[in-house]
């Protein structure tokens, strides 16, 4: 009984790891198109992400990045 339970746990764990490893790169790979800048001053990561979602509905991430000497909130998304 313990051997069967151990085998089921290992198989389940393997399937979960396989599912996670294939889905994460797909979602991040589609989020590389620059959509524009969002007005967040000073730029904070959480605020940048939420403002990007407000301004660009198909934004999947917002990052604070240097643009010249200033930090700006850049919004990224994908087009289907």
UniProtKB/Swiss-Prot annotation:
Subcellular location field: Secreted
Signal peptide extent: 1-29
Gene Ontology CC: extracellular region; secretory vesicle
Presence of keyword ATP-binding: no
The UniProt record lists the keyword Secreted: yes
Disulphide bond pairs: 43-64, 48-73, 52-75
UniProt keyword annotations, A-Z: Antimicrobial, Disulfide bond, Fungicide, Plant defense, Secreted, Signal
Family under the similarity heading: Belongs to the DEFL family.
Protein name: Defensin-like protein 204
Species annotation: Arabidopsis thaliana (Mouse-ear cress)
């Amino acid at each position: 009984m313990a051997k069967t339970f151990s085998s089921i746990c290992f198989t389940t764990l393997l399937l979960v790891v396989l599912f996670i490893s294939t889905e994460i790169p797909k979602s991040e790979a589609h989020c590389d198109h620059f959509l524009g800048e969002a007005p967040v001053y000073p730029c904070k990561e959480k605020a940048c992400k939420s403002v990007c979602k407000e301004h660009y509905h198909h934004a999947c991430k917002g990052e604070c990045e240097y643009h010249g000497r200033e930090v700006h909130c850049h919004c990224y998304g994908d087009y289907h």
